[in-house]
């Protein structure tokens, strides 16, 4: 019987094999997704030149089992590779210090204004709403930073990510990286994308309905009705999951994760300690304290959740054969959906309304997504690929109708045991 670590090596990159699972900062889950597959394209789009240089210095290994041949590159895949090279050459992957200075200052300003209105003018409800908006916008900013879009030095990205993610948000950046990078590597692929594993209470595929317990199926029958309530509560769930994940870091096989344990724990402890002290010293009553706490958390959670769910969840979930047949770039286009560009939409969605472009190149700075989207749309037209781009309210309708499909399926499913 192979140990988990043995099962997770080697990884095939550019016709060579490497053992990276024991130190990979992006997590072991993404490595697991590419066992027995060529990971070249996924590696290329999720790393900068620094990682390529490090890879060249690593010893190559001889795998103990036969690896598949390097994945064939079709015309569409080749065109997207060429476009990436053009974008690099024209500086589109270079972050604007001015833009990110503006984004950091305005995002912090939302939180400062919220606290100021509560402390100075006792405007508790308005202040709590602003604080919730701060949490939402800080979520997108942390997302940019943890994808290494913001700073050229990855150590600065990691440090600021800890401050903004753990300290100001209460989210573990290591927990986020582990799940989010796996999601990027295998979007909407059942058994590989952790984002679509939401049982209970949400079913996103026929397989989910089949696997659900009889009690879960009863619940799923109404999922399109309670979905928005779940969005409101998700920040609480995520924060709780982050605490559990950070507690487990010190026992992980991945040495990078073990090295992050103390930093992550200090960041989360600081977030909740400062929040508790604010409520203790600046809230006039327990009721006001509860109002501020729940309004800010619910607004922040809903603002993040509704964006995240809209961009790829209402699209068909696929298995390994379809995933392998698409190739990386084409697969991302088939399994992601944009939301129509616009000033308000771009701000509220934090650039994730350009989900197609972001999934093609996760390290592309947010402020360049709009310009690049026109080029991607043209390539999609050239290769007869879908470029979904509904308005925000249309995207929500698509999402709710998709949930309703599996709600009806759960209603018709025999009341036997889950498979």
UniProtKB/Swiss-Prot annotation:
Catalytic activity: an (11Z,14Z)-icosadienoyl-containing glycerolipid + 2 Fe(II)-[cytochrome b5] + O2 + 2 H(+) = an (8Z,11Z,14Z)-icosatrienoyl-containing glycerolipid + 2 Fe(III)-[cytochrome b5] + 2 H2O; an (11Z,14Z,17Z)-icosatrienoyl-containing glycerolipid + 2 Fe(II)-[cytochrome b5] + O2 + 2 H(+) = an (8Z,11Z,14Z,17Z)-eicosatetraenoyl-containing glycerolipid + 2 Fe(III)-[cytochrome b5] + 2 H2O; an (11Z)-eicosenoyl-containing glycerolipid + 2 Fe(II)-[cytochrome b5] + O2 + 2 H(+) = a (8Z,11Z)-eicosadienoyl-containing glycerolipid + 2 Fe(III)-[cytochrome b5] + 2 H2O
CDD domains given in the database record: Delta6-FADS-like (cd03506)
Compartments, as annotated in UniProt: Membrane
GO molecular function per UniProt: acyl-lipid (11-3)-desaturase activity; metal ion binding
Cofactors demanded by this protein: Fe cation
KW Transport (keyword) present: yes
Transmembrane segments annotated in the record for this chain: 110-130, 156-176, 226-246, 266-286, 290-310
Motif window: Histidine box-2: 180-184
Primary localization class, coarse: membrane
Domain Cytochrome b5 heme-binding as annotated: residue spans: 1-64
Miscellaneous: Euglena gracilis exhibits the metabolic behavior of a plant in the light and of an animal in the dark. Grown in the dark, this organism contains large amounts of 20-carbon chain length (C20) polyunsaturated fatty acids (PUFA), including arachidonic acid (C20:4n-6), and little or no C18 PUFAs (such as linolenic acid, C18:3). On the other hand, when grown under photoauxotrophic conditions, this organism is rich in linolenic acid and contain relatively small amounts of the C20 PUFAs.
Name of protein: Delta(8)-fatty-acid desaturase
Protein's organism: Euglena gracilis
Organism phylogeny: Eukaryota, Discoba, Euglenozoa, Euglenida, Spirocuta
Gene: efd1
